[in-house]
């Protein structure tokens, strides 16, 4: 035992020796130095990180933050006040003196009790929240408290986003400290109360007072102030109008009592006020008088699309997020100068509202729904296509609630035959496939054409017959579907869609066939809408008066920020070349025929030239007219939101309305024409073959078949007409009764006709030269295939099995009605 004690003592002495103590001391010394260095390094790294975040913070624009108290304003094209910006986000700016003292104290008490003491951030609250959150984590609670002051919340609402990150929090704290250096406490609190989210679409205490109590904010009592003060922490949870809280109001009632308790604790209200308020809640609860009515602007149809366009342009130019641009538009003090002509806008609305304009529609056109809104609706757009500025845009007929669906701008529908100038004849002429005088056969599709177009069975014309050889001009005037399908097939679906998309039409995945490009039949799936609207069509038809150039349509001319700086400007229009100047002019000239002598005569007004095209969708469910003058382009739509048949024709209803509104737009304007470009010529053509005429084309028993029409230089036909042929027949001897079979040696001799020498100044069009020259509907026994001859011109068949002869001149067969009519898609459009 003694030996063991001695060994233990020796080890203890060795351990406590100065040498060993020195090692321990050194270890502890270096350990603490290491900890210190690690701490210094960590602090340095964190400091550098924080400093880098601060440096990346957005510049504090105090005026911009205060401008959240300024409503954005819209002006008309003369600079006169139109509307205050009202978005779906309801926000009504009020001054500090309009806000009750109890409401200010309620927010301060429950949100930031040391608001009047701190300099932007509450250090005491930060450490208190950290300790509370750590304690909660240790106890298994997932509840996390926040430490943001009112100043920080204002910075988040006005400058930053709702992103949850340390970076955003550091920026928020830094900017809050900076803001306190520039604004008084009352200025900060007032701006905060005008911008704080209050649930749903309500922002600011004034909007909330209207929603919950139908009161001006200045008229709120103590309990109502306490309720709104408690609402902002969790607007959905404490929403007294929600169904859940109506059944069990204890959540928002207890929250209101908590606000009152805090106000009393801080000395903002007396004990008597506190007790009276609590007794009122216990006895009567909180009496809500909800007001969910959305505010309506003075020029609802024009204002909201203009705001939409400005938002999109701001996001594109300045890379704003949706949240940022919504804040800026709602209350950023912007001045938006629109292109709206106030008088024209009002007058177009009156025309669309007038029940007398819909008398041709026989199935109760003035019927209203349960909200007092006409079931039969209409929309219209008028554009100065040179500048792209929209002068009038009306999205509905009759009085309608705020935020009603704008059919002129937001809606997309099938456009029927209004597509034909845009995606059929315009592209065909532009691509050099023909001119106004090129001929296409209005006849049933051949088997080859059925296959190439995708039709299983024969499509039909609206007029339910076939007209035989038609010029492009006549085909578009009478809106031949068969002719359009054949020409569109030559153009190619992909080419047609490319033109249509550049013109603003939208093609969904199921609307990429020839029935869409030739006839305007869009699928228009509710989940994937496509087609066009009057805004789109008015812009598109403007190209025919603007040398083939589409000027981007704009509803505003410029936007100024709250400091008066121009932040958006449309004085230099965005332009896209669609057609050549020559092709666009030829289409314009063709489109005048439907107004001058076709189904759209009522679209004509005064002495101003008018060109346009009707459109009808399947089953007479939509009627359209789109057109232009040398000054403006416009489009009209009439139909039901829930489509149903209208039992008349597009030209009967839409063209008179077009004439009326465009007459108003052209008041006091002088006659002028669209300027004819160089590079086009009027060329003599045979209206039966579409080829160069010979002298025989003038000898047709129906009258001369030669006429003159526009072609782009170099695209006119080069082949001579082979329809009209001069035959010499050896007639039998009528005195010989026995020679009925004896003249086998008699031969028909064909002589080559002379080329016709046309007068190149002749301006006759087919309908002007001989109104009786239109082919009849006599069935033909010949091949109805369409051939492409001479520079891509679509021409009718050339090899016939049966010829009608008269005076030795062979005339072409007429279109037949004897084809299979069991078509895959026999919907009729015009």
Swiss-Prot record:
Q: Where is this region: Disordered?
A: 1-20, 731-830
User: What Gene Ontology terms describe where this protein resides (cellular component)?
Assistant: outer membrane-bounded periplasmic space; plasma membrane
Q: Keyword Hydrolase: yes or no?
A: yes
Native organism is: Clostridium perfringens (strain ATCC 13124 / DSM 756 / JCM 1290 / NCIMB 6125 / NCTC 8237 / Type A)
Record keywords, A-Z? Antibiotic resistance, Carboxypeptidase, Cell membrane, Cell shape, Cell wall biogenesis/degradation, Glycosyltransferase, Hydrolase, Membrane, Multifunctional enzyme, Peptidoglycan synthesis, Protease, Signal-anchor, Transferase, Transmembrane, Transmembrane helix
An MF annotation (GO) of this entry = peptidoglycan glycosyltransferase activity
Membrane topology (Extracellular) = 52-830
Report the protein name in the record.
Penicillin-binding protein 1A
> For the region Transpeptidase, what residue ranges are annotated?
378-663
The family assignment reads: In the N-terminal section; belongs to the glycosyltransferase 51 family. In the C-terminal section; belongs to the transpeptidase family.
């Amino acid at each position: 035992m003694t030996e063991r004690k001695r060994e233990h003592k020796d080890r203890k002495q060795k351990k406590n020796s100065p040498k060993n103590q020195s090692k321990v001391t050194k270890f502890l010394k270096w350990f603490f130095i290491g900890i210190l260095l690690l701490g210094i390094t960590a602090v340095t790294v964190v400091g550098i990180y924080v400093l880098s975040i601060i440096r990346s913070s957005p510049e504090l624009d105090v005026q911009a933050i205060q401008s959240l108290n300024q409503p954005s304003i819209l002006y008309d094209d003369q600079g006169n006040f139109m509307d205050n910006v009202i978005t779906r986000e309801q926000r009504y700016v009020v001054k500090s003196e309009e806000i009750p003292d109890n409401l200010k104290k309620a927010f301060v008490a429950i949100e930031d009790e040391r608001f009047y003491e701190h300099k932007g951030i509450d250090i005491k609250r930060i450490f208190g929240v950290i300790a509370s959150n750590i304690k909660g984590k240790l106890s298994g609670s997932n509840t996390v408290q926040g430490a943001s002051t009112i100043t920080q919340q204002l910075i988040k609402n006005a400058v930053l986003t709702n992103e949850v990150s340390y970076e955003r929090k550091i920026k928020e704290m830094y900017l809050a400290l900076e803001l306190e250096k520039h604004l008084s406490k009352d200025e900060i609190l007032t701006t905060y109360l005008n911008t704080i989210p209050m649930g749903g679409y309500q922002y600011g205490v004034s909007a909330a007072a209207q929603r919950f109590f139908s009161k001006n904010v200045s008229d709120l009592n103590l309990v109502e102030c306490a309720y709104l003060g408690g609402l902002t922490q969790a607007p959905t949870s404490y929403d007294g109008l929600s169904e859940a809280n109506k059944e069990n109001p204890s959540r928002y009632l207890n929250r209101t009592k908590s606000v009152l308790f805090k106000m009393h604790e801080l000395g903002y209200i007396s004990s008597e006020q506190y007790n009276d308020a609590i007794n009122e809640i216990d006895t009567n609860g909180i009496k809500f008088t909800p007001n969910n009515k959305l505010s309506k602007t003075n020029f609802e149809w024009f204002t909201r699309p203009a705001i939409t366009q400005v938002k999109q342009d701001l996001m594109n130019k300045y890379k704003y997020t949706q949240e940022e641009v919504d804040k800026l538009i709602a209350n950023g003090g912007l001045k938006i100068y629109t292109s709206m002509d106030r008088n024209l806008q009002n007058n177009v609305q009156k025309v669309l509202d007038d029940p007398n304009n819909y008398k041709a529609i026989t199935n109760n056109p003035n019927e209203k729904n349960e909200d007092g809104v006409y079931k039969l609706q209409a929309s219209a757009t008028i554009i100065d296509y040179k500048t792209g500025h929209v002068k009038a845009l009306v999205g509905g007929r009759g009085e309608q609630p705020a935020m009603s669906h704008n059919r002129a701008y937001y809606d997309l529908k099938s456009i029927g035959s209004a597509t034909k100038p845009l995606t059929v004849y315009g592209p065909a002429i532009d691509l050099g496939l023909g001119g106004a005088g090129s001929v296409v056969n209005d006849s049933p599709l051949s088997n080859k054409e059925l296959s190439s177009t995708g039709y299983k069975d024969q499509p039909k014309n609206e007029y339910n017959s076939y007209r035989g050889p038609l010029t492009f001009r006549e085909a578009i005037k009478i809106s031949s579907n068969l002719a359009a399908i054949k020409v569109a097939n030559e153009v190619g679906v992909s080419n047609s869609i490319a033109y249509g998309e550049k013109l603003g039409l939208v093609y969904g995945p199921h609307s990429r066939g020839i029935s869409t490009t030739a006839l305007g039949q869009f699928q228009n799936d509710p989940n994937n809408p496509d087609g066009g609207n009057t805004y789109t069509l008015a812009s598109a038809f403007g190209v025919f008066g603007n040398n083939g150039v589409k000027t981007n349509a704009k509803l505003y001319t410029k936007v100024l920020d709250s400091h008066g700086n121009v932040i958006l400007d449309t004085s230099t229009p965005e332009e896209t070349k669609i057609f050549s100047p020559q092709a666009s002019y030829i289409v314009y000239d063709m489109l005048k025929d439907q107004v001058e002598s076709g189904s759209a005569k009522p679209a004509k007004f005064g002495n101003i030239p008018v060109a346009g095209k009707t459109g009808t969708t399947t089953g007479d469910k939509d009627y359209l007219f789109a057109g232009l003058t040398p000054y403006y382009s416009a489009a009209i739509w009439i139909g039901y939101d829930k489509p149903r048949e209208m039992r008349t024709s597009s030209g009967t209803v839409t063209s008179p309305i077009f004439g009326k509104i465009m007459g108003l737009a052209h008041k006091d304007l002088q006659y002028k024409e669209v300027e004819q470009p160089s590079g086009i010529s009027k060329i003599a053509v045979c209206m039966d073959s579409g080829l160069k005429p010979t002298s025989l084309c003038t000898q047709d028993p129906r009258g001369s078949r030669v006429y003159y029409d526009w072609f782009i230089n170099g695209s006119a036909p080069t082949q001579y007409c082979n329809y009209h042929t001069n035959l010499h027949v050896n007639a039998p001897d009528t005195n010989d009764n026995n020679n009925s079979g004896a003249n086998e040696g008699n031969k028909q001799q064909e002589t080559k006709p002379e080329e016709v020498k046309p007068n190149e100044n002749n301006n006759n069009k087919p309908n002007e030269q001989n109104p009786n020259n239109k082919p009849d509907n006599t069935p033909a026994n010949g091949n109805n295939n369409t051939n492409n001859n001479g520079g891509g011109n679509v021409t009718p068949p050339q090899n016939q099995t049966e010829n009608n002869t008269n005076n030795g001149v062979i005339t072409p067969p007429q279109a037949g009605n004897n084809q299979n009519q069991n078509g895959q898609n026999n919907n009729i459009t015009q």
